């Protein structure tokens, strides 16, 4: 059977490119997953592939190849994918769609330094090109520790899989953390780019795949309502919070030595800051979006002195959800003298005309009060209030809160008169909820991002410069913490250490209670 070659810019010839009503469907292609035995592949990647197929967004001849150090047959691999899909898929299970997807499954056993295994992988993909018409177009998903990226990329290069000929394409997908600091990030980027050109590298930040994060662009640039007040004249400060209520039991191998700042602030929260603070791009072309994010990150720096504008903590024993939980140092796998922070908060300044003088407060942590991610623009108080103090006792500051998860949506908080004969003003909320406004469920972030990889659409993926600028911003705080003692303890189920509360109180502000 003659291979079916498809151009990198494959388009459905029956569809008008201006028609936005129909979803984009990937052309002939396949995907190889390295690290198929890990949690990421099992809980996120495999279910997302099935959900895309179930929604009709993958080509009928799509192939999925697993690579791991296991003595498995293709049938064994298929069972692993089946179990993952049954447990974690978002859409209903349909046997017919599953059977069609499973026809494209293959498995290659081997280690990352095994030349023969990669030769077998190349042979397997060549057969799939001939038998299923994948067209020589393959995405390589590295669901593996970053230390293994260079050796896998080199093996893909040696086996001829990294640089396809003609109109075929090869793309590599890598997961955070993108390095440990600026120096290691540059080293990692250099190793990956030695094999794959930058336009073929897709760095997954799953927060950018969330509908509410993408809605920041619509909220800001499709509505005249918000732009006039989206600046230092009206905004007092911005709070970006990612809180989790879970602990780290069983994750010591990954988390110990990394900590909350490297795990979340360097990537997720810096990207949320960039989307919140960037200027309007000339278009939604990937290069235009990336240019604006790079500009705002270039203008961002840590506020000083760092002992007053940053905070780090480590959760101690406490109560969470009605249960008594242990502290980090009593979790399995953590040394009793571990200095890994489970809470981090920093103050950033964005030195642009729009944001000069507006502090951006970023915080993240484990074992906090509840699971929530939000961006809150807190506005300045009205310059003159013709009310006496008793009328406004319960009045706070106006705020716009973008809820990323859970209960995705937007809340506007403002003052309103309480019904009655007296002039009493109290805060009220105006709510927009995705779940109420739209009948269709939001797709899982990995669905959108994997589809974008297969389509060659890089808008939602950070480039080298963004990654390195984020490290450049964060590194001074990491170095300061390393040189100054241990993290402050905070009780599980609370909202972080006292030092984080004091960080805002020094300036007359308070953290929002999500």
Swiss-Prot record:
Name the UniProt record assigns to this protein: Glucose-6-phosphate 1-dehydrogenase 2
Chain positions recorded as substrate binding sites: 206, 210, 244, 263, 366
Keyword Oxidoreductase on entry: yes
Swiss-Prot/TrEMBL catalytic activity: D-glucose 6-phosphate + NADP(+) = 6-phospho-D-glucono-1,5-lactone + NADPH + H(+)
Pathway(s) per entry: Carbohydrate degradation; pentose phosphate pathway; D-ribulose 5-phosphate from D-glucose 6-phosphate (oxidative stage): step 1/3
GO BP of this protein: glucose metabolic process; pentose-phosphate shunt, oxidative branch
Gene behind this protein: zwf2
Pfam families referenced in this protein's UniProt entry, alphabetically: G6PD_C, G6PD_N
Function: Catalyzes the oxidation of glucose 6-phosphate to 6-phosphogluconolactone.
EC number: 1.1.1.49
Sequence similarity: Belongs to the glucose-6-phosphate dehydrogenase family.
Active site: 268
Cellular compartments per GO CC: cytosol; plasma membrane
Keywords: Carbohydrate metabolism, Glucose metabolism, NADP, Oxidoreductase
Residues involved in NADP(+) binding: 69, 176
Class of the enzyme per the UniProt entry, highest EC level: oxidoreductase
Gene Ontology molecular function terms on file: glucose-6-phosphate dehydrogenase activity; NADP binding
């Amino acid at each position: 059977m003659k291979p079916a070659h498809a151009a990198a810019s494959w388009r459905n010839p029956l569809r008008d490119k201006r028609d936005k009503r129909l979803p984009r469907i990937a052309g002939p292609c396949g995907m190889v997953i390295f690290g198929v035995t890990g949690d990421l592949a099992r809980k996120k990647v495999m279910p997302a592939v099935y959900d895309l197929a179930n929604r009709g967004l993958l080509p009928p001849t799509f192939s999925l190849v697993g690579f791991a150090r296991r003595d498995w047959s293709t049938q064994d691999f298929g069972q692993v994918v089946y179990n993952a899909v049954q447990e974690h898929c978002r859409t209903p299970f349909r046997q017919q769609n599953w059977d069609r997807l499973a026809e494209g499954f293959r498995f290659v056993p081997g280690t990352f330094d095994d030349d023969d295994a990669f030769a077998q992988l190349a042979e397997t993909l060549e057969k799939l090109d001939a038998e299923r018409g994948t067209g020589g177009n393959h995405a390589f998903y590295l669901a593996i520790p970053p230390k293994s990226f260079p050796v896998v990329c080199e093996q893909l290069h040696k086996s001829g899989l990294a640089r396809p000929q003609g109109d075929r394409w090869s793309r590599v997908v890598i997961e955070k953390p993108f390095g440990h600091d600026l120096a290691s990030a540059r080293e990692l980027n250099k190793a990956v780019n030695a094999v794959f050109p930058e336009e073929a590298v897709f760095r997954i930040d799953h927060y950018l795949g969330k509908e509410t994060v993408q809605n920041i662009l619509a909220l800001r640039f499709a509505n005249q309502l918000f732009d006039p007040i989206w600046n230092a004249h009206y905004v007092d400060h911005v709070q970006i919070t990612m809180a989790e209520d879970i602990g780290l039991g069983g994750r010591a191998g990954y988390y110990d030595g990394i900590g909350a700042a490297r795990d979340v602030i360097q990537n997720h929260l810096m990207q949320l800051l960039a989307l919140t603070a960037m200027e309007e791009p000339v278009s939604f072309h990937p290069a235009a979006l990336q240019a604006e994010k790079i500009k705002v990150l270039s203008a961002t720096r840590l506020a000083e002195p760092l002992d007053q504008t940053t905070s780090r903590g480590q959760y101690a024993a406490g109560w969470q959800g009605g249960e008594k939980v242990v502290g980090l140092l009593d979790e399995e796998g953590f040394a009793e003298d571990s200095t890994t922070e489970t809470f981090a908060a920093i103050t950033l300044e964005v030195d642009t005309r729009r944001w000069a003088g507006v502090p951006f407060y970023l915080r993240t942590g484990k074992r906090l009060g509840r699971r929530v991610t939000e961006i809150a623009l807190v506005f300045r108080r009205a310059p003159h209030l013709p009310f006496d103090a008793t009328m406004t006792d319960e009045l706070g500051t106006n705020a716009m809160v973008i809820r990323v998860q859970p209960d995705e949506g937007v809340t506007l908080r403002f003052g309103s008169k309480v019904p009655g004969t007296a002039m009493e003003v109290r805060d009220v909320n105006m709510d927009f909820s995705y779940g109420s406004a739209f009948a269709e469920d939001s797709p899982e972030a990995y669905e959108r991002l994997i589809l974008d990889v297969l389509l060659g659409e890089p808008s939602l993926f950070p480039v080298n410069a963004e990654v390195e600028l984020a490290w450049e911003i964060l590194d001074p705080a990491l170095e300061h913490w390393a040189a100054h003692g241990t993290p402050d303890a905070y009780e599980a189920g609370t909202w972080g250490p006292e030092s984080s509360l004091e960080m805002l109180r020094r300036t007359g502000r308070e953290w929002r209670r999500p």
